[in-house]
UniProtKB/Swiss-Prot annotation:
Residues 379-390 have a biased composition (Polar residues). GO terms for cellular component: cytoplasm; mitochondrion. The keyword Phosphoprotein applies. Residues 1-27, 378-401, 446-518 are annotated as: Disordered. The gene is MDM36. Residues 495-518 have a biased composition (Low complexity). One of its GO terms (biological process) is mitochondrial fission. The modification Phosphoserine is found at residue 42. Keywords: Phosphoprotein. Involved in mitochondrial distribution and morphology. This is Mitochondrial distribution and morphology protein 36. It comes from the Eukaryota.
Length: 579
C-alpha cells in the first residue's frame, strides 16, 4: 500500500499472515500506532487518567487526517470508493465515541470507593495480605486473626459492601450490553463491505484499515472491562458467602448455649469456614494473575469455572442446612417435652366426646324444662295464649340459647356435633310444640267431657223446667190474659239476672230442684266461658258482644237468637235440640 492508499500490483493478499507481511504491516503508520497502543504496553495505564479525551485523541487525529485526504480526492479516483471511504470514516467517529464510553466506564469502576474497599476487604478477610499490607500465610495469622475475625462477625459491613458492589456490577453489565450491540453494528458494516461483497482488497484501504484497527482495539478494551466487572462480582460473592457461613456458625453457637444439644454441627461448620478461607486465599491470587494478563488468556476462564463450583457447593450446603433446621424445628414443636408446647396444651380443654354429648343433651333438656316450667308457672288466659305465635316462641328460645355459658359455646365449637346442633335444637323445639299441642288437645278432651255432662244436665234441666212451666201454666189458667213471653225478659237482662227473674215465679214443688239446677248451669257456663275456646285445629274464637247465651240449647229453650258458637261445639249438638 502506497501513500495514497492504493494496493501495489506485486502485493499478494494471501501473504498477510506470513512473517514478512506482518513485518511490513508493522511499518504501516496506522497499524503500527495501534500495536504500540496495545493493552500490554504502558499506554494502557494512561487510560485511567481523568482526561479521557486524551486517551482517544491519537485515534481522532488519525481520523481527521484521513478525512482531509478523502476531501482532497488525492488518493482515490473511483466515485464509489470515495463514498465508501466517507461512510467508513463516519463509522470510525461513531466507534471513537463508543471507545470513549468504555474508557469512562473503566474510570468510574476504578475510582469507585465501594470497589476499592471491596478489593481491600477481600485481601484482608481471606488473609492474602494483612491490614499493614504484608502478605501472610494461613498458618502465620494464628489465633489473633481468628479473634479479630470473631470480633467483627456481628458487623454487617462486608454484607452491605458486597451487595452494593453486586448492584453496581449489574448496572455496568447493562451498559456493556448496549456498547457491545453498537460495536457489533460496526463489525457488520465491515463484513458487508468486504467479505460479503467479495472485496477483501478494501481492507487495505486506509479508511477501512483504520476502522478495523479501531474495532479490534475497542473489542480488547470491552473484553478487559468485562473481566474487571466479572472479577468484582466474583469477589463480592465470595465475601458474601463467607459472611453467611459465619452467620450460620453464630446461630449454631447461640443454639448450643440455650439448649443442651450436641455441638457436632458447629465444629464441622467451623472447620468448613477455615478450609474455605484457605482455599479462597489461593483462588484470589490466581484471579489477580489472570486479570493482569492478556484478556484472551484461558486462566481467567478457569477461575470462573472454579467460582461456579464454589457457588454450587455453597448453595447445596445452605439448602441442606435449611432442610435440617426445618426438620429440627418441626421435631421441637411436636416434642411433648417442650415447655411452650406443654403450656399451650394445658391452656386447651381436653374434650371427651361421651361427656360432651351428655352435656349437650342436658343443656337442651334444661332449655326445654325451663320453657315448660315457665308455661306452668305463668297463668295465661285463653286470649293471651292464642296471641302467642310460633315466631315469638322462637325468639324466646333464641334468647335462652344466647344466655348459655361461654364454656358450653367453646365445647360445642370444638366438637363434631357443631354442624348437627341447629337441627337438634329445631327438633327439640318441634317436640316442645307438639307437646303443647297434645296438652291443648287433652284440655279440649276434658272440655268435651265436661260439655257432654253439661249437655246432659241441660237436657235434664230442660225437662224439669218444661214440666215446671207446664205446671205453672196449668195452675194459673184462671188469669184473664196470659203472662208476657219469657223471652222478653231475657232481651234486656244479662244471664246473671236470670235467677232473680226466675225467683219471681210462683213456688212449686219442684222450685228447689230448679233453683239448684239453675245454679249448676251458671257454674258450668262460667267454667265454659273461662276455658280456652281453641280446639285441636287451633281455631281461635274471639268473644263478641251479642244477645243471648253462648249455648244454642239455652237460646233455643228460651227463644233467643244464638251468638257465635264454635264449629267443634256445633258438631257435637244433637239435631233434636234445634226445635
Amino acid at each position: 500500500m502506497d501513500e495514497n492508499g492504493t494496493v501495489k500490483p506485486g502485493y499478494e493478499l494471501k501473504g498477510l499472515n506470513s512473517g514478512n507481511s506482518r513485518s511490513n504491516m508493522d511499518k504501516d503508520p496506522i497499524v503500527s500506532k495501534f500495536h504500540r497502543a496495545g493493552l500490554n504496553d504502558s499506554a494502557d495505564e494512561e487510560d485511567t487518567d481523568i482526561n479521557g479525551n486524551r486517551n482517544t485523541s491519537w485515534i481522532t487525529s488519525m481520523i481527521s487526517e484521513e478525512k482531509r485526504k478523502v476531501e482532497g480526492k488525492s488518493m482515490l479516483n473511483d466515485e464509489e470508493d470515495l463514498h465508501l471511504s466517507k461512510a467508513t470514516l463516519n463509522k470510525c467517529d461513531a466507534l471513537v465515541k463508543i471507545l470513549a464510553d468504555i474508557i469512562k466506564l473503566e474510570f468510574v469502576i476504578h475510582q469507585s470507593w465501594y470497589i476499592r474497599s471491596l478489593h481491600k476487604s477481600v485481601l484482608i478477610q481471606f488473609e492474602v495480605e494483612t491490614s499493614g499490607g504484608n502478605k501472610n500465610s494461613a498458618g502465620d495469622s494464628g489465633d489473633d486473626d481468628d479473634d479479630n475475625h470473631n470480633g467483627n462477625l456481628d458487623d454487617s459491613f462486608y454484607k452491605d459492601l458486597s451487595l452494593k458492589c453486586i448492584k453496581k456490577c449489574e448496572k455496568s453489565s447493562l451498559a456493556l450490553e448496549s456498547l457491545s450491540r453498537d460495536i457489533d453494528q460496526i463489525r457488520d458494516f465491515i463484513m458487508s463491505n468486504t467479505i460479503e461483497d467479495n472485496r477483501v482488497d478494501r481492507l487495505l484501504q486506509n479508511s477501512m484499515t483504520l476502522l478495523l484497527e479501531c474495532w479490534i482495539y475497542s473489542m480488547k478494551r470491552l473484553r478487559r472491562l468485562r473481566m474487571k466487572i466479572a472479577g468484582i462480582f466474583v469477589r463480592s460473592k465470595l465475601l458474601l458467602i463467607d459472611h453467611e457461613l459465619v452467620t450460620i456458625w453464630h446461630f449454631l453457637q447461640e443454639q448450643n448455649e440455650h439448649e443442651t444439644v450436641n455441638n457436632e454441627n458447629e465444629l464441622k461448620l467451623a472447620e468448613t469456614i477455615k478450609s474455605y478461607r484457605a482455599f479462597i486465599k489461593i483462588f484470589i491470587q490466581q484471579l489477580e494473575d489472570s486479570e493482569s494478563g492478556s484478556p484472551s488468556s484461558s486462566l481467567f476462564e478457569e477461575c470462573l469455572h472454579v467460582f461456579l463450583d464454589i457457588e454450587s457447593m455453597y448453595n447445596s450446603l445452605n439448602l441442606n442446612w435449611l432442610l435440617n433446621e426445618n426438620k429440627a424445628l418441626q421435631e421441637r414443636l411436636l416434642s411433648p417435652s417442650s415447655t411452650s408446647e406443654n403450656d399451650h396444651t394445658n391452656n386447651l380443654p381436653v374434650i371427651d366426646e361421651t361427656k360432651e354429648i351428655e352435656d349437650i343433651s342436658s343443656f337442651v333438656n334444661s332449655i326445654v324444662d325451663a320453657s315448660m316450667l315457665t308455661h306452668d308457672l305463668t297463668p295465661i288466659n285463653s286470649s293471651d295464649s292464642d296471641n302467642l305465635s310460633n315466631g315469638e316462641i322462637d325468639r324466646l328460645d333464641g334468647r335462652r340459647l344466647s344466655s348459655s355459658t361461654s364454656d358450653m359455646s367453646l365445647m360445642m365449637q370444638r366438637t363434631s356435633l357443631q354442624k348437627q346442633l341447629p337441627s337438634l335444637l329445631t327438633a327439640f323445639n318441634n317436640a316442645r310444640r307438639l307437646e303443647q299441642e297434645l296438652q291443648n288437645a287433652c284440655k279440649v278432651n276434658d272440655n268435651k267431657h265436661s260439655t257432654k255432662d253439661t249437655d246432659s244436665n241441660i237436657r235434664r234441666n230442660e225437662h224439669a223446667m218444661s214440666s215446671s212451666v207446664s205446671s205453672i201454666i196449668s195452675q194459673n189458667s184462671t188469669l184473664a190474659s196470659p203472662s208476657p213471653p219469657m223471652s222478653s225478659s231475657f232481651i234486656s237482662t244479662a244471664p246473671s239476672q236470670s235467677s232473680s227473674r226466675m225467683s219471681t215465679l210462683p213456688l212449686s214443688p219442684s222450685s228447689s230442684l230448679l233453683e239448684s239446677q239453675s245454679q249448676t248451669l251458671k257454674n258450668n257456663m262460667s267454667q265454659w266461658l273461662n276455658q280456652s275456646r281453641s280446639g285441636l285445629n287451633g281455631t281461635k274464637l274471639i268473644p263478641t258482644n251479642h244477645i243471648g247465651f253462648h249455648s244454642n240449647v239455652l237460646n233455643t229453650l228460651y227463644g233467643i237468637g244464638g251468638g257465635p258458637v264454635s264449629k267443634s261445639y256445633k258438631s257435637n249438638q244433637p239435631s233434636s235440640q234445634n226445635t
